[in-house]
Amino acid sequence: MKSKLKLKRYLLFLPLLPLGTLSLANTYLLQDHNTLTPYTPFTTPLNGGLDVVRAAHLHPSYELVDWKRVGDTKLVALVRSALVRVKFQDTTSSDQSNTNQNALSFDTQESQKALNGSQSGSSDTSGSNSQDFASYVLIFKAAPRATWVFERKIKLALPYVKQESQGSGDQGSNGKGSLYKTLQDLLVEQPVTPYTPNAGLARVNGVAQDTVHFGSGQESSWNSQRSQKGLKNNPGPKAVTGFKLDKGRAYRKLNESWPVYEPLDSTKEGKGKDESSWKNSEKTTAENDAPLVGMVGSGAAGSASSLQGNGSNSSGLKSLLRSAPVSVPPSSTSNQTLSLSNPAPVGPQAVVSQPAGGATAAVSVNRTASDTATFSKYLNTAQALHQMGVIVPGLEKWGGNNGTGVVASRQDATSTNLPHAAGASQTGLGTGSPREPALTATSQRAVTVVAGPLRAGNSSETDALPNVITQLYHTSTAQLAYLNGQIVVMGSDRVPSLWYWVVGEDQESGKATWWAKTELNWGTDKQKQFVENQLGFKDDSNSDSKNSNLKAQGLTQPAYLIAGLDVVADHLVFAAFKAGAVGYDMTTDSSASTYNQALAWSTTAGLDSDGGYKALVENTAGLNGPINGLFTLLDTFAYVTPVSGMKGGSQNNEEVQTTYPVKSDQKATAKIASLINASPLNSYGDDGVTVFDALGLNFNFKLNEERLPSRTDQLLVYGIVNESELKSARENAQSTSDDNSNTKVKWTNTASHYLPVPYYYSANFPEAGNRRRAEQRNGVKISTLESQATDGFANSLLNFGTGLKAGVDPAPVARGHKPNYSAVLLVRGGVVRLNFNPDTDKLLDSTDKNSEPISFSYTPFGSAESAVDLTTLKDVTYIAESGLWFYTFDNGEKPTYDGKQQQVKNRKGYAVITVSRTGIEFNEDANTTTLSQAPAALAVQNGIASSQDDLTGILPLSDEFSAVITKDQTWTGKVDIYKNTNGLFEKDDQLSENVKRRDNGLVPIYNEGIVDIWGRVDFAANSVLQARNLTDKTVDEVINNPDILQSFFKFTPAFDNQRAMLVGEKTSDTTLTVKPKIEYLDGNFYGEDSKIAGIPLNIDFPSRIFAGFAALPSWVIPVSVGSSVGILLILLILGLGIGIPMYKVRKLQDSSFVDVFKKVDTLTTAVGSVYKKIITQTSVIKKAPSALKAANNAAPKAPVKPAAPTAPRPPVQPPKKA
């Protein structure tokens, strides 16, 4: 079986990064089992890869299911283990004290039993053996040289489901049907045959379920469980459409349109082989083709007769689970041999030789001519279930020490032919670890063999399927998205899921929450009217009590097939199909009561927290339950309602008459066979029971002359979620309050769209009406109808979506608008495109930006259908610059026959679907047809195939080139380059030959003198300097002039429009070294100094030294002299221009100062004179009184002696001039 490869392409925006160093964002990561290996664009691994399970120190039973790269710094991975077991606490007492506990818990004891392979032996639940094997989100941080270091893990815990006491009826404590009741009823309805969580598969003509032979002791247990819940016993249909897995093993003959099984109790009604034909021919054919029917001969687990046993199916089931087949498709080479070197206990003979010292195990495998037909006609049910993510204990194997068995897988076998075991089916080339042994080629073809322990214990013990709640938990951890520290985990597109997780990257664990209701949008008024009239969706005077009851349930379906989720900017975008469908009447009689009517809608009330399961079982819900005692619930998720004389008109009061199945003599009276289908994976059986019915997930029947076709359309639920709503969902999930136990957060910006399935998935419809709906056509010839589906759901009319990828659409910018967000989803027959408004966090209005919020392009695949199988999607890449989405598919994983039961000639190779933002192009055989009904485009680029080599991986390099990794007959890896020519990828032999020359490096080395992948660089002679008068140029001048640099070399491209440039490096003042940078197929330029993740590429590009440049430019001296003179002139001018005016001002100032001084002197003299007069007058005044007094004195006095004369006083000097 081919290794499962998952590819991630990361674009490099060179303008944002230094040319010398290429970021790790330009590498690819290939997933090989649990190992993530970073690849360069040259298909070369950077290192040995990261084994995420071992790095996180988890049990080897864990497998990697999804991962996301967060820039260059973080890696987020999702892992899960098939050893997980979940138990449901069924409260039987009225004691309310326990109702606050979670009804769901991990069952470590059952996990230990599963690990030991024992159902009854003791289990050690202490210490390391008490693991619950829950799913985890692993976070790794980046380390140098493209490596990753484990940082932490986040446990995905179970949702909180409030326990309810017995006697609370169908209504929970909040007045609504609770999830507790839903899960309780799921467990009751599940169970009785191995692989079958639903007893409805094993039934007898017209006999009630409780009397069907389930095996020793199981009948009474069944009755007891149902009686406790007050459920009535329901009759089975009138024909056997089921099988018991301990007899028929549910094989489908791939070149026929019905499965081959052994009918129960010799009943011969129903499609397929009866007991006589089975025993006489088909049984032997199945045993020879598919060993799991019952091994015969040496090493066999027992003949088919030993599988009859009782209901416990001890030895037969054990042998089925223990087989280890080697699958090789039919070959024209009769002498091709593959054999195992030594005998093994069961199945093909094998032994693993384990070298000493922990070296890798080597296994030789050969094949005999008698084994060439193995698995060429039949497919095993358990293997198909395992492929879609269902836990099948016997197929869950992992590597480890002291392995007791092997599982061998061919690289060119289809994935549907071998057990899809964790340690086997996804194994690729050995990496040196004990978990991935090396290969030893012993014949024309080599196979990959993985050593690993099979279950311990006695072969008489039974490995039963885990309960349905365990399966729901396991399959709900299938894909993840990372948004700014919040991680969203959801289910798959193959099994309906009930819940999802939103956890923070800093949490240690996070609980799940479940889907809230969404409003139904039926598309057209007519379609809505159909549903209202037939199902009682509208409450009016004509509605009867049954319809009112159905209305009360709200037609809600919280079970989804997750088509995909992705992150764009700071928003999460998701899309899913509701697990149900609407059937239409195919009658051409316009007077018939069922003409143009939608006759059934599956509410999947068993999963409906608002409706409840009991109402369906007791036939109180009208259409979706037992009808007139002739129809019974077939499985947990979906129902089939074949109708004859269905309720008509708007009264809805006619008697329901059901004929089941429609037989040849009843064709004229039957009006419809309505397909109500919850899981689309039914390609391995299309009549009666499918392989997925074994899990209770699906029911489907063939469109042939004995059954009128129906039309089934679905509701596509989609939305955009911001960070705030994600946070609310995460916080709400942790709540244990009663209100939050039944109603979870509803994302406000979600919507549903009624998405029809294109009619051309059934061939031979009349072409009149130009693609009119099939049910609206006249003259339909029922006998010529044939499934034309190209995917793995070949015999289902149900829709299916995969590969959702979101991105920024810059197209509105050209019209003056902001860019919006776009997401593309591939569905059967076309492309769905969703457009979101980033400003409002909502879908675009129909008038916004000239874009519709949702568009669907009906684009048939035509004869190129062999290139497209939606179930084999490997990767999707969106390139905003070109507006293209690239979907890569692995054709090697397709079944041997397609939906038309015609053998496909070439199954080895890859296909790429290109979806563009505008227009519709369908490229087929180099012919292009342009359609215009929707703004999404579909182009099948076929041709990536190999007739001799095994293709193991594809790396889309651009919209023009893809690199394909292949292994030849000697198991030597090589790379081929495919070129897109008019929509078809064709191998380019010359380029493929060129990329081989890598000399053990990361990239192909450059080869002097030849035109290889890097083209050829011819340097000019040094004389070019004189010829072009460059000797007067300096090195810096040349480096900064691309035109001059380009004249130094001549480039011969290896492919059209390949570009090259020279980069100059100054080595001295007169010498220059030039090196080329050359464009590779991915559109990026690489040079000698380029690195990826810090690792030099060492391409060995040539270089050339040119000498003789001028040390100084010729203009340096004149400029220097001129600049000096100029400076002097400037200084002189400045001096003169400033000094002269300053002198004049000085002179004027001096003259002004003189005048001022004169005036001051005059004023000073005047003031001095006045001051002198004042002093004189003051002296005279002082002497006057004393003289007057002396004159008045009459008495004579003695004569006075005259005084001596005094010296004269100096004159008073005027003030000195300042």
From Swiss-Prot:
Ranges annotated as biased composition (Pro residues): 1205-1218
Signal peptide region: 1-25
Keyword vocabulary terms for this entry: Cell adhesion, Cell membrane, Membrane, Signal, Transmembrane, Transmembrane helix
Ranges that cross the membrane: 1121-1141
Pfam families: MGP3_C, MgpC
Compositionally biased spans, kind Polar residues: 217-231, 411-428
Region Disordered, residue ranges: 109-129, 213-245, 262-353, 411-440, 1192-1218
CDD domains listed in its UniProt record: adhesin_P110-like
Any GO CC annotation of this UniProt entry: plasma membrane
GO biological process: cell adhesion
Compositionally biased intervals (Basic and acidic residues): 265-286
UniProt subcellular location: Cell membrane
Segments of skewed composition (Low complexity): 116-129, 301-342, 1192-1204
Keyword Cell membrane part of the UniProt annotation: yes
Membrane-topology descriptor: Single-pass membrane protein
Record's protein name: Mgp-operon protein 3
Taxon lineage: Bacteria, Bacillati, Mycoplasmatota, Mycoplasmoidales, Mycoplasmoidaceae
